[in-house]
Amino acid sequence: MLKWPIPGQVALFQILRCRGNSRRTTVTSLTVSQVGQNFTFVLTDIDSKQRFGFCRLSSGAKSCFCILSYLPWFEVFYKLLNILADYTTKRQENQWNELLETLHKLPIPDPGVSVHLSVHSYFTVPDTRELPSIPENRNLTEYFVAVDVNNMLHLYASMLYERRILIICSKLSTLTACIHGSAAMLYPMYWQHVYIPVLPPHLLDYCCAPMPYLIGIHLSLMEKVRNMALDDVVILNVDTNTLETPFDDLQSLPNDVISSLKNRLKKVSTTTGDGVARAFLKAQAAFFGSYRNALKIEPEEPITFCEEAFVSHYRSGAMRQFLQNATQLQLFKQFIDGRLDLLNSGEGFSDVFEEEINMGEYAGSDKLYHQWLSTVRKGSGAILNTVKTKANPAMKTVYKFAKDHAKMGIKEVKNRLKQKDIAENGCAPTPEEQLPKTAPSPLVEAKDPKLREDRRPITVHFGQAL
């Protein structure tokens, strides 16, 4: 394996070479018929920070180009990988070295800045705080093209209930894009559990893990997975556009919110822009936008969150039941903890989610939140103008993304698999070993496959040069 180190800066370049059945390169040994596939794996460290492995695998090649980075710049790194592959094909070693040397010396630039690495190589630094748009965002575009609206809604509901989810596909690029694209629709929340965009063959036992997960499986491995003891697993087959689930999660969500989301998705199915992401953002705001009404503010005391006030804010029984379950979910708990940290530090926050709350009918009379704003403006804490008038440093935004995106480290999976084996052999775990459960659903029902919807206008745009 050849490494091109870029310490503390943008990325680490590697060439992964396939050597028989070596576990370190198993992910690159899957059979593919497509020429020049781009895909992504994720490494989660002991601090639960994610490092992305952006890869380019050519058909029949014995090596895979890989860029490792904490920066979620999918389009940028895929573009650079394609340029490097082109240099390799044309044997342009000087240009190859020039690009990597420039990248090596490059400090992390601010969002929106144009970066020139060589005469023909440049990119614009993405702003991860903006909503992803079609066709610019490759992950969302591939996900929206491959999966119909009905199955997108079912998968969204399954993620809200923190289920065990497997996504299956024969094409690595589409597989990992669907994993990243679907998870992005949870914004401003992030998937907090096991997150593996493409699972190597020697780690298939992870599919039997007793905790929530979001895992991508190459189709060639699915026969082995089917022979495993899969309990309460949601399976989306991207190739056939079919979804299997033992739960009734979508029907248990408030119907008015889901109906509005479905209608918005159908309206934007033949258009470009951030319409898809904004449709999900509006749904998230409808579900969770009243959290500001549940903030408890007392003089000289830290701001806290009252779950009872949050749930009782709604008259609808369906919404109350959903929110009662939601308050026990890790993705919601981490979201609230993050907001409280910012409020209590006096830093505040301003993002597209808060903007959506302010514009929508779900804002209500969040007097406590505005009381905090008034107090801050009078001088008891830092003022919000640093958030409203200045872009946050790129590294702060990115590292927060990496940390929030997966709080549960992969390290815990093996321990919990061992606990599951002990329990199955007749030894009940102690109370301290009890695992977090996924949210309950009132009914259990298998879902019928739905036909794929036609999105030719989107596919026409997808695939254009960056």
Residue ranges of model-derived segments:
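Acidic, Ser/Thr/Pro/Gly-enriched alpha-helical scaffold modules and adjacent low-complexity linkers
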Residues: 2-418, 422-456, 460-463
